Amino acid sequence: MTSALFGLNNLAPEGVGQNFRTTMRRFPATVTVITACATGDQRDHGMTVTAVTSVSMEPPSLLVCLNNRTFLHELLLCRPDFIVNVLTQDQIALSDAFSGKVSPEERFRNGEWQRHDNGVLYLPTAHAAIACRRVAAMPYGTHTVFIGQVVSADVSETTRPLLYENAQYCAASPAGLSA
């Protein structure tokens, strides 16, 4: 339905898909753990995600792209509240845990999680924690773009974010200009 709206088709020239995949692997991305909570039973869920970016400053909002086959995708369609936890360079083990190397039931045993006013767990030791309320969801191809209006945002001035590029973790550091 919305795929037609966006002109989605599978007519990409041969090889473009693989070349695009290789190209995107070389884009450094900030590593986040997105958390949400199922209704009623306080069943918490989280997943490592790198497809996150700001949308607008007025109103403050960001977008998250999630594969349609993930449980987090289904959860965000049902529950509007989620938190984007931007991990620090020291939180690789957390990223690994939430990327599927640890069962969903065990993931929150890593780290010192606290419950936000919206009922969702967040990580106070993260580089940043951005609480959002879903205001839109747009399917496209294998993924859905979720837009979240920011309800609170906190960032640490003493940590650096964890990055991921070419299937490995990277450190963020200021770049110097040569004279």
UniProtKB/Swiss-Prot annotation:
EC number from the UniProt entry: 1.5.1.37
InterPro entries found in the cross-reference section: Flavin_Rdtase-like_dom (IPR002563), NADH-dep_flavin_reductase (IPR050268), Split_barrel_FMN-bd (IPR012349)
Species per Swiss-Prot/TrEMBL record: Rhizobium sp. (strain MTP-10005)
Family to which the UniProt record says this protein belongs: Belongs to the non-flavoprotein flavin reductase family.
Annotated metabolic or biological route of this protein: Aromatic compound metabolism
Alphabetical UniProt keywords: FAD, Flavoprotein, NAD, Oxidoreductase
GO MF term set: FMN binding; riboflavin reductase (NADPH) activity
Entry's induction text: Induced in the presence of gamma-resorcylate.
Name the UniProt record assigns to this protein: FADH(2)-dependent resorcinol hydroxylase, reductase component
Keyword Phosphoprotein in annotation: no
Pfam families: Flavin_Reduct
Known partners and oligomeric status: The FADH(2)-dependent resorcinol hydroxylase is composed of two subunits, GraA (the oxygenase component) and GraD (the reductase component). Both subunits are required for activity.
Catalysed reactions, as listed in the record: FADH2 + NAD(+) = FAD + NADH + 2 H(+)
Function: Involved in the gamma-resorcylate (2,6-dihydroxybenzoate) catabolism. Reductase component of the resorcinol hydroxylase, which catalyzes the FADPH-dependent conversion of resorcinol to hydroxyquinol. Catalyzes the reduction of FAD by NADH. The reduced flavin is then transferred to the oxygenase component GraA.
Domain of life the protein comes from: Bacteria
Annotated gene: graD
PANTHER family registered for this protein in UniProt: FLAVIN REDUCTASE, FMN REDUCTASE (NADH) RUTF
UniProt key word Coiled coil: no
